[in-house]
């Protein structure tokens, strides 16, 4: 799970041919405001991102533009370099979660998760162009796949405000 630090209001800019957030490499749709279901949830301008820099998301991610732009930087500076030419490159990011109005780790009484503000995305793995699947659950800390995941995680730690991986808790 990666999440951004809170920031003041942000502007959503729609680009040409399905681009969002003013970045032609981020494809998706603007979905507008998401009303708060409970106090602390919701976001002013949500986007539903379907691909970033040519890499498809397994399911579109509902996030804010700051998160989308940070995710794009991570794809370019972390994910793609970590994978390199292995398997022909990255075809897909497996998204396990994005916007959801819920408490942290779905624990009753906990603070609202960054997911509830559109500032977090859970990534469970990647699929390479040759069909190879690398998952956090199966491959973390194991062989070349584990090295790829560790490199991806390290760059995410530099890009996002909060990054939770397998060492964080049983939920990640």
Question: Where are these predicted regions, by residue range?
Answer:
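Active-site acidic/histidine clusters and adjacent loop/turn architecture
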Residues: 12-94
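Short acidic, glycine/proline-rich loop/turn micro-motifs
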Residues: 60-62, 105-107, 136-139
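Active-site-adjacent substructure of cysteine-protease-like catalytic cores
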Residues: 84-118
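Catalytic cores and adjacent binding grooves of peptidoglycan-active enzymes
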Residues: 36-38, 44, 69, 80, ...
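Residues that form or immediately flank small-molecule/cofactor binding pockets and catalytic motifs
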Residues: 54, 97-98, 141
